[in-house]
Amino acid sequence: MIGWLLDTNVTAEIISAGGSARVKAWAAVQDEATLHLSILTIAEYDKGIANLPDGDPRRPVYMTTRDSLAARFAARLLPVSDAIVRRWGAISGTVRRDTGHPPPVIDTLLAATALDHDLYLVTRNVRDVRHSGAAVFNPWDDDHSAFAVLPRQRRRRPSQT
């Protein structure tokens, strides 16, 4: 893997004053260039903002947070491409067939994004993506030393025939 795709629950934990010390410690030792966000994380902030009543004092705070994340991760903000959507369709269908339950849409789209970009999916929602095929890291519980990140230039993709 070449880096980390942060789920919204991880970004919220990192920036929260009362966030998990373990999650913050993990994030603090990562090379910033290896951390990525999906546009879906920004959309989840938009959803949270839209869900607040008019005049809610948290609205400007959440808007500033969203805008700061978008700016900070601008070069590492991953879109939902056609390839990712098609991979998500395959993941969702397979998980539903194998488990009998439809998987959460956003979580499995994040898993498809992580797979497409050769990233670990960093989330607390391990149960929601465990059948996706993505490599999942839970910073609340997992030992990060077991998750190697290789420099991009050393990474090799198998040749396609």
PLM regions: where:
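Acidic, PIN/NYN-like endoribonuclease modules and their adjacent C-terminal/linker elements
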Residues: 111, 115-161
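Short, well-structured N-terminal submotif of metal-dependent ribonuclease cores
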Residues: 1-41, 50-68, 145-146, 154-161
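Residues at the C-termini of beta-strands that transition into short coil/loop
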Residues: 39-40, 81, 125, 140
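Alpha-helix capping/helix-boundary segments
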Residues: 10, 41, 84, 110, ...
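Residues that scaffold the ATP/ADP-binding catalytic core of kinase and kinase-like folds
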Residues: 13-14, 48, 87-88, 132, ...
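Active-site neighborhoods of divalent-metal-dependent phosphate/nucleic-acid chemistry enzymes
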Residues: 47-52, 74-120, 153-161
